[in-house]
């Protein structure tokens, strides 16, 4: 296991938080363009200062805790999602020699951290002592547990081809070709599961405003609500980075750009895809989402593993 220098570690973690905050502006601006309207354009050039204005507004809002809530759990819950998402970035290989930690079970570490994030939503729904919050947290738990299975199975094809759980070795194994082509079914399954894991539209059923008034964060306001918000965008960035690492060669690309630039550009493409889904697709019913997972995603990912193993055994 190799650990980066303290300056690199601090720089990476701070950069991820700044990027997550900036993505709020990107999403609002892009959705405005796609919906033929301006989006935020009042604070700073092109509205770039809107994020700072929103942060100031949230900071000065009343930090209210419902009197019927379980106060210690209510306070801790928002921090869990931010901490787990930030810790997930420590195994992401951004470029050769650029990363926090390089160890052999980086992919398993990512799955472990992503599964812990749902505790934030479950505890928030429980501690709020609100029926809508509790229903949202139960939806979040069932959705995350189900789609974690499919995400893990989708990644197994890549592990079989690379022969390693080390994310840096998986990237280096793609020097002769990205895994998105031989693992296209696995890529599609991983992408769908990532959207469901992030609880992003159209799979934002745990917080569906039209159904359960905001779900698990119904009772939250101020900085605590902001932590949930930033945690969501950290999850989008983390899952986009893992998608790029597993299926699109990570930092690998033509020499006219440095490796870190290739990694950032590829990750940005998937972040914009996450945003586009919100603007383009309607939300399915909850039973349809769960049925799709177990009746379509599970057979697809299992078939992908079987085919990958069969091809690997037949080709010397």
Swiss-Prot record:
Q: Which protein family is it in? A: Belongs to the complex I subunit 1 family.
Q: What is this protein called?
A: NADH-quinone oxidoreductase subunit H
Q: Which gene encodes it?
A: nuoH
Q: Which NCBIfam families match?
A: PRK06076.1-1, PRK06076.1-2
Record text on subunit structure and interactions: NDH-1 is composed of 14 different subunits. Subunits NuoA, H, J, K, L, M, N constitute the membrane sector of the complex.
Catalyses which reaction? a quinone + NADH + 5 H(+)(in) = a quinol + NAD(+) + 4 H(+)(out)
Which terms under GO biological process does the entry name? aerobic respiration
Give the primary localization class: membrane
Say which species the protein is native to: Methylococcus capsulatus (strain ATCC 33009 / NCIMB 11132 / Bath)
Q: Which HAMAP family match?
A: NDH1_NuoH (MF_01350)
């Amino acid at each position: 296991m190799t650990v980066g220098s303290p300056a690199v570690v601090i720089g990476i973690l701070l950069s991820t938080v700044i990027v997550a905050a900036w993505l709020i502006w990107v999403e609002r601006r892009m959705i405005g363009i796609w919906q033929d309207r301006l989006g935020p354009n009042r604070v700073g050039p092109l509205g770039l200062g809107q994020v700072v204005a929103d942060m100031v507004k949230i900071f000065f809002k009343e930090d209210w805790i419902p009197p019927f809530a379980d106060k210690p759990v209510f306070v801790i819950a928002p921090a869990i999602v931010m901490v787990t998402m930030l810790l997930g970035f420590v195994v992401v290989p951004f470029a050769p020699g650029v990363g926090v930690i390089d160890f052999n079970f980086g992919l398993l570490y990512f799955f472990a951290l992503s599964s812990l994030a749902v505790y934030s939503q479950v505890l928030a729904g429980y501690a709020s002592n609100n029926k809508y919050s509790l229903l949202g947290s139960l939806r979040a738990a069932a959705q995350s547990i189900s789609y974690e299975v499919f995400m893990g199975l989708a990644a197994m094809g890549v592990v079989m081809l690379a022969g390693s759980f080390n994310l840096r070795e998986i990237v280096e194994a793609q020097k002769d070709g990205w895994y998105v082509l031989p693992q296209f079914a696995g890529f599609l399954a991983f992408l769908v599961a990532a959207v469901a894991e992030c609880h992003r539209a159209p799979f934002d059923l745990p917080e569906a405003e039209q159904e359960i008034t905001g779900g698990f964060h119904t009772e939250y306001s101020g900085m605590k609500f902001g932590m949930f918000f930033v945690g969501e965008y950290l999850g989008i960035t983390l899952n986009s980075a893992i998608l790029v690492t597993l299926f699109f060669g990570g930092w690998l690309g033509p020499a006219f750009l440095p490796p870190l630039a290739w990694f950032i550009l590829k990750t940005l493409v998937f972040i914009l895809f996450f945003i586009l889904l919100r603007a383009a697709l309607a939300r399915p019913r909850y039973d349809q989402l769960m049925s799709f997972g177990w009746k379509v995603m599970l057979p697809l990912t299992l078939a992908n593993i079987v085919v990958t193993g069969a091809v690997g055994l037949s080709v010397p």
